[in-house]
C-alpha cells in the first residue's frame, strides 16, 4: 500500500458508483515520469548540460557515422518544436558540441553533426546513464524488468495511438 492507493480509496469512497481502477496506474505513471526527469537531470548535471540538450547529442550518435541529421529530423525524433530545436542547436554549437554544414543532398538544407568534443561528451554521459540505470533498477530481476517493459510498451502504444499529434 502506498499514498496512491490511499488516494484511490478516497476517490472510490467519494464516488462509489464509478470504477476508479484506471486511476492508480495513471497516477503512478505520472509520478514515475516526474521522477525519471529528475533522474535524467541528476545524471547529466555533473556534465553541465541539460537532459534535453543531451537528447540531441544522443540522437546524433544513434544516427551512426557520420553522426549527422537534418534539423527537421532532430525535432521530429525528439518531439520538439522547430523553434525550440533551433535554440538548442545554437547553444550546442556555441559550446562546440555540434556543427552545422550544408546538406550535400539538398542545397537548401543543412546537417547538424557531432564534433569530436560532442561525441566524447555523449559517450561519457551515455556510460553514466547506463551505470546509473543499472544501479537504480538492480532490485528488479531480469524477468521482472522484461515483463514491466512489455507492460509499459503496451501502455505507451495505447497513449500514442490515442493522443499523439
Which role fits each region the language model picked out?
Residues 28, 55-59, 120:
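Pre-recognition alpha-helix immediately N-terminal to the DNA-recognition helix
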Residues 39, 43-46, 128-140, 154, ...:
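Generic non-transmembrane alpha-helical segments
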Residues 90-150:
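Charged, amphipathic alpha-helical coiled-coil/dimerization segments
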Amino acid at each position: 500500500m502506498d499514498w496512491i492507493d490511499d488516494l484511490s480509496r478516497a476517490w472510490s469512497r467519494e464516488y462509489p458508483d464509478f470504477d476508479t481502477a484506471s486511476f492508480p496506474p495513471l497516477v503512478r505513471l505520472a509520478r514515475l515520469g516526474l521522477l525519471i526527469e529528475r533522474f535524467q537531470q541528476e545524471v547529466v548535471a555533473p556534465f553541465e548540460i541539460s537532459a534535453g540538450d543531451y537528447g540531441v547529442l544522443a540522437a546524433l550518435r544513434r544516427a551512426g557515422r557520420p553522426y549527422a541529421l537534418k534539423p527537421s529530423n532532430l525535432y521530429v525524433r525528439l518531439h520538439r518544436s522547430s523553434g525550440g530545436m533551433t535554440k538548442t542547436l545554437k547553444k550546442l554549437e556555441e559550446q562546440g558540441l555540434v556543427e552545422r554544414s550544408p546538406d550535400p543532398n539538398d542545397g537548401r538544407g543543412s546537417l547538424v553533426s557531432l564534433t569530436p568534443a560532442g561525441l566524447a561528451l555523449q559517450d561519457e554521459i551515455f556510460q553514466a546513464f547506463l551505470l546509473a540505470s543499472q544501479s537504480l533498477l538492480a532490485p528488479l530481476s531480469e524477468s521482472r524488468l522484461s515483463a514491466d517493459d512489455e507492460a509499459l510498451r503496451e501502455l505507451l502504444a495505447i497513449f500514442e495511438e490515442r493522443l499523439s499529434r
